[in-house]
């Protein structure tokens, strides 16, 4: 009986997201700034006020300065969750597969950084698998922003 309750609560948590598959992300949410905590310099992101930032709008040809549209894959990872840590090798393979396609961008969005792994440790683990692939990582700031937007149960 308890298993059913837990399963029901878990499944319901996935239904309360801002965006569902096929939804257009609002301009306000596209403009929300996320701190890049790893890989900015390898992805052409310039610091602003000493910080590296990105927005989802940076990859939208209607709103960015280049007019180029990108396919954006966002890997959602929690630093405390073992399966996310173990998934790094798979992500490196995906990143390596698309690294020569300038219109595909892959971002790892980290939540709960420092519990136990830092952004630097996460990036270094990527580099361990393939030193030629530089991941791009953002810090969700323990606010569960992207987690709640994209139906991950955050």
Residue ranges, per PLM feature:
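Boundary/junction segments of secreted and surface-exposed precursor proteins
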Residues: 18-36
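Sec-dependent N-terminal signal peptides
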Residues: 3-15
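A short beta-strand-turn-helix
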Residues: 31-72, 93
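Short, solvent-exposed loop/turn and secondary-structure capping segments
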Residues: 84-88, 118-121, 148-149
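Structural recognition of the beta-strand scaffold that forms the well-ordered cores
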Residues: 72-76, 104-110, 134-138
């Amino acid at each position: 009986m308890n298993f059913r309750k837990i399963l029901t609560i878990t499944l319901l948590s996935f239904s309360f997201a801002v965006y569902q598959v096929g939804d257009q992300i609002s301009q306000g949410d596209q403009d929300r700034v996320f701190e890049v905590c790893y890989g900015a310099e390898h992805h052409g992101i310039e610091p602003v006020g000493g910080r590296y930032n990105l927005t989802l709008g940076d990859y939208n040809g209607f709103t960015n300065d280049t007019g180029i549209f990108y396919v954006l894959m966002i890997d959602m990872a929690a630093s405390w969750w073992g399966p996310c840590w173990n998934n790094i090798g798979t992500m490196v393979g995906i990143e390596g597969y698309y690294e020569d396609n300038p219109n595909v961008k892959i971002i790892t969005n980290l939540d709960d950084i420092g519990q136990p792994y830092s952004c630097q440790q996460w990036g270094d683990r990527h580099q361990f698998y393939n030193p030629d692939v530089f991941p791009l990582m953002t810090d969700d700031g323990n606010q569960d922003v992207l987690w709640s937007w994209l139906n991950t149960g955050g």
